[in-house]
């Protein structure tokens, strides 16, 4: 799991303290609870020195019925919106790094019995690896300027 996904999970847990499942969902999971699978990733070109990865995280919320699950999903989505769509980025030890994850889109929808879904999207930029090139030392000109 990357630090951005972990930071989003921590933010959701701070607003709704229920068990969070991140691997396979067990047969007998606790209700209410959250299921956070790994995000889907889409790559894009960005600048001459960076590329962009857009993440889509499909969080499932489980409650006693679908209406309660959707209400909780809407409440959590509003908590992210009220924070200006900014979630503090946490280190692996759980400490704030001073950076933020900017959420670009949140979608909530009702699911099957006792289930709702939140789709959370954000983008991150990464630098290309730079190869070492020899530095130009001298330029010799054989003809004059016209």
Curated annotation (Swiss-Prot):
* Origin superkingdom: Bacteria
Which family is this protein grouped under? Answer: To B.subtilis YqbJ.
Q: What is this protein called?
A: Phage-like element PBSX protein XkdJ
Q: Which organism is it from?
A: Bacillus subtilis (strain 168)
Its organism's taxonomic lineage begins at: Bacteria, Bacillati, Bacillota, Bacilli, Bacillales
């Amino acid at each position: 799991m990357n630090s951005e996904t972990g930071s989003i999970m921590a933010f959701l847990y701070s607003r709704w303290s229920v068990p969070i499942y991140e691997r396979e969902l067990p047969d007998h999971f606790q209700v209410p609870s959250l299921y956070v699978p790994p995000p889907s990733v889409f790559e894009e070109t960005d600048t001459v020195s960076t590329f962009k990865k857009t993440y889509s995280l499909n969080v499932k919320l489980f409650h006693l019925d679908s209406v309660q699950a959707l209400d909780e999903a809407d409440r959590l989505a509003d908590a992210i919106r009220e924070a200006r769509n900014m979630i503090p980025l946490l280190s692996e030890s759980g400490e704030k790094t001073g950076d933020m994850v900017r959420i670009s889109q949140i979608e909530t929808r009702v699911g099957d019995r006792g289930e709702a879904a939140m789709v959370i999207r954000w983008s991150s930029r990464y630098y290309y690896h730079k190869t070492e090139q020899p530095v130009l030392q001298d330029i010799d000109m054989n003809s004059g300027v016209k």
